[in-house]
Amino acid sequence: MEQQRKAAHSGWYHETQSSQQGHLPLDPHAALAQDRFLLGQDAQLDPTLRSLIHERQGLLNASRACYDVLFPDSLKVSRTETLSLYDRLSSALTVAQVSGVQPLCSHYAARLAPLSSPDASRESNIRQTHITQFARLLATQPTLITPPMLSQLNDVGLSTQDIVTFTQLIGFVSYQARVLAILNGLRGRAAAVLPGFPSPEGCEQKGYSLAMLQWSSRLPEVAPESASQHQQDVLDLIAPDARSSS
């Protein structure tokens, strides 16, 4: 299996670590953070910095809401949504580990620990391998993601809706890691980078432009007339003029 948790050592180990030596103990309380986005890291800032952080309550509330949608306490899978809570949290742990932000690793490891892992069938192992490899690559070297890699996710059983959710949660945890790293920096502490990981790609300014760019989906598009009621409601909320302009 790609993911392994060593209960005998009361700790966590994930296949993206370079070795099992020196892995950190699992803190079960890390899953119980009242603020599952900042994980209590803001409480250790001096009062002036803490007040500046909390002036951005709109952004923080939106981030917490995203967390709750992507990582609920319970989740039922269906024919069109096969990405289980185990899949989501194990992928989040992969992204947290390649980010090297220890509180984030502890949190997702603690949430993952009580869950039952998938069966050990060949198909399940292949699926977990593809999910883990894609999560790691998108989090560290996103420019290497190709259309065939997206097709491979579909080949191992992820629906288009699964793939969208999957890439969203990878992006969210990467964003969360950066916020926590900034908080650590404000406290004068560098994020603890685990050994054996490649450095994430830097962002190039030339990648941003105000010019009108052409865009095409790499996933099958959903026609408005065949969309579910929930999808139509979301479309009306975020783009009220989309139907009339299409």
Region locations from a protein language model:
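Hydrophobic alpha-helical segments
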Residues: 1-246
